[in-house]
Regions:
Chain A
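Alpha-helical transmembrane segments in inner-membrane proteins
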Residues: 1-344
Length: 344, 330
């Protein structure tokens, strides 16, 4: 095991991280409970908990078969996305890296859209792995393109071009289908947690769990990467292997989520920034648990808002996360960096 | 061969190719017209009124709009890449396509079937460009992509509330030249006449700007007004093209790239060469999209009438990869 000294740039007492993590966990639990209570019909927390424990409860189906898997999927998917964002941002030392801007999500979407629209009849359990193929391919191309540069503009441009290519492919795939498929396709271009049940959760949860475990094992090495390649190599960390592993894990997490929920943007970008801001540390291993919790919290809360705000119309959660995520990201980034003189 | 001689050769060759494309477009279509009839219909001497409608109202506008939109997208790409100083930028980077789509969607949701679509797209794209100039001074690339994401999300939200215009809007997002009419061409050509010369007039200043901001300012370029003008021209070109043909991807990325390979980075040559290349590229892709008709296993009907944007995306991906390779080697 490599021992790395505490290398947080702005080190604060560890207790703050613990405190914030506990508070975020409590908030996430509260959101989970709210997700069980609200809906048609809305019930109190006691009734919702009774429905979970009592198999004969009249609300059993609504709460346990519809609301519970959806909320849990939101937690799991959000945690996976948040950690994917953290892995990419720290391993690539790029504050704006995230699966949605690296083309990883759109690569997965192409595969999912092809499976859905062409009716290929691939079993649900296999879909995340096929989506992973698309995600890894798109992500590898983008990473190849980015090379050694850390200029956020360059990263964003390559990712945008890859997303455009994938978007064109998705539309080409849909063009192959019948006219009625257009609406179906549209649904797959938006991330959503609607109509997801236990099978989706059972598919995604093990992959996300494995991804989180991998990130936990790699946390010290990735933290070393944030200090720069030379320093990391000096500390005995295999730089290239660690980076490849981190990106692969991030692609796995993003692909699993995209296979079940479609492309949900900006949770992965936002969760690490929020976690770093809340704890005041940039240490990968310290913020890792909080990032997972924050991602889940963000997604469940966004889904709750997406369900209720325009009721009876339900907004796909991907829209809500984009509308909230972009301004939040701009705000978070604006305060951190001084304004450079050069445009580009 | 010097770059300028090569540029003349490319432009001449491109014009010839454009002429060949016009002929090819006029001769291909759903109905099989003999070449003689096509020529007679062109000069208005056909004995069959239906042939005149097919040639003059369907086929001719389609190829002309394709050529014009391709040229505008390519020039817009040159300008955007110059502003951002990154050869991977393209008109879509500015978010104007998303802005146009949002305006079109809003119009269709509020007034279904209303013929306001063209002005809506144009105004939406131009307004997005204005917003970008205000908010994006720090990094046009990042701001443009994020702006595009937000606009796309609002578009999706509108479509979730009212899903009737999905088909139309998706075709906008991808770009399609199907069913263009003489009206589309009439709305497009004035932009060509205005934007292309202005872009060419900006070329020598773009060369100065390419030296870097401090050097450009030292040489007497006023950065603020200059950027505003270039961005305005770039957005106007993209807006006109997108309003006519939809947000076709990669033409604005690939045409300047190929142009740079052929004549180098001098914008005085790059602007006209890219315009010609973009026109040929889009029209050629459209010919391919129009002619493709394949039977795939598992599908009931033949695949045909694919939007041209899907073809450019398919062709654009490998080009993107090669571009990226070159970039990473540097």
């Amino acid at each position: 095991m490599i021992i790395i000294p505490d290398c947080s740039v702005r080190s604060r007492p560890h207790s703050r991280t613990v405190l914030v993590t506990v508070a975020a966990t409590a908030l996430a639990a509260g959101c989970l409970l709210a997700a069980l209570c609200l809906g048609q019909p809305s019930v109190g927390p006691a009734a919702a908990l009774a429905a979970v424990t009592d198999p004969e409860h009249p609300l059993r189906v609504a709460v346990v078969e519809v609301r519970l898997p959806r909320a849990l999927l939101g937690l799991v998917a959000g945690a996976g996305l948040g950690v994917a964002g953290l892995l990419l941002q720290d391993a690539l030392r790029n504050p704006i890296a995230g699966p949605e801007l690296l083309g990883v999500s759109s690569g997965a979407t192409v595969v999912v859209a092809a499976i859905v629209v062409l009716g290929l009849g691939v079993p649900l359990a296999l879909q995340p792995w096929l989506a992973l193929g698309g995600a890894l391919l798109a992500g590898a191309l983008v990473l190849l393109a980015i090379g050694r540069t850390r200029d956020p503009a360059h990263v964003v441009l390559v990712g945008a071009a890859m997303s455009a290519a994938c978007g064109g492919l998705v539309v080409a795939v849909v063009g192959l289908g019948t006219q009625g498929n257009v609406v179906v396709l549209f649904r797959y271009l938006l991330g959503s947690l609607a109509a997801r049940g236990w099978p989706h959760l059972e598919t995604v949860a093990p992959i996300v769990g494995a991804g989180l475990a991998g990130a936990w094992l790699l946390r010290r090495r990735i933290e070393a990467l944030t200090l720069g390649d030379e320093v990391a190599a000096g500390l005995g960390v295999p730089v290239v292997r660690t980076r490849v592993a981190a990106v692969g894990l991030a692609a796995l997490l993003a692909a699993a989520v995209a296979a079940a929920c479609g492309p949900i943007a900006f949770v992965a970008l936002l969760a690490p920034h929020l976690a770093r801001r809340a704890t005041g540390t940039t240490s990968t291993r310290r913020v890792l648990p909080l990032v997972a919790v924050a991602g889940g919290l963000l997604l469940v809360a966004a889904d709750l808002a997406a369900r209720r705000l325009l009721y009876p119309v339900e907004m796909p959660v991907g829209i809500a996360t984009t509308l909230v995520g972009v301004p939040a990201l701009l705000l978070l980034r604006r305060r951190r960096q001084p304004r450079p003189a050069v445009t580009g | 061969m010097t770059p300028s001689a090569r540029a003349v050769a490319v432009v001449a060759g491109g014009l010839l190719a454009g002429l060949a494309l016009v002929l090819a477009h006029l001769l291909t279509g759903r109905s099989d017209l003999p070449a003689g009839e096509v020529v007679r219909a062109l000069v208005g001497r056909s004995e069959h009124p239906a042939y005149e409608v097919i040639v003059l109202d369907y086929r001719l506008p389609r190829v002309l709009v394709g050529l014009g939109a391709g040229a505008l997208l390519a020039v817009s790409g040159v300008l955007v890449q110059a502003v951002v100083r990154n050869p991977l930028a393209e008109p879509a980077t500015t978010g104007v396509g998303a802005g146009a789509a949002l305006a079109v969607t809003g119009t269709l949701v509020l007034w279904p079937g209303h013929p306001l679509v063209y002005p809506a797209a144009l105004l939406g794209a131009l307004a997005t460009g204005a917003v970008l100039y205000v908010v994006g001074r720090r990094s046009f690339a990042v701001a443009g992509v994020l702006l595009g994401a937000v606009l796309a999300a609002v578009t999706s939200l509108l479509l979730v509330v009212d899903s009737a215009p999905i088909g139309v809007v998706l075709r906008w997002l991808v770009g399609s030249l199907n069913a263009r009419t003489p009206v589309d061409w009439a709305q497009l050509w004035p932009w060509l006449v205005v934007v292309l010369p202005v872009a060419w007039l900006l070329a020598s200043r773009l060369n100065v700007w390419a030296l870097g901001e401090p050097a450009a300012i030292g040489l007497g370029l006023r950065a603020g007004p200059f950027l505003a003008v270039v961005l305005l021209v770039a957005v106007a070109a993209a807006a006109a093209a997108i309003a006519a043909a939809g947000a076709v991807a990669f033409v604005g990325l690939v045409a300047p790239h190929v142009g740079r390979l052929l004549v180098g980075a001098d914008h005085r040559l790059l602007v006209p060469v890219s315009a010609v290349l973009g026109a040929v590229l889009l029209s050629l892709a459209d010919l391919a999209a129009f002619s493709v008709s394949v039977q795939l296993p598992g599908l009931a009907t033949d695949v045909s009438g694919v939007p041209v944007g899907a073809v450019t995306a398919l062709l654009g991906a490998p080009v993107l990869i090669s571009l990226v390779r070159r970039e990473s080697r540097r």
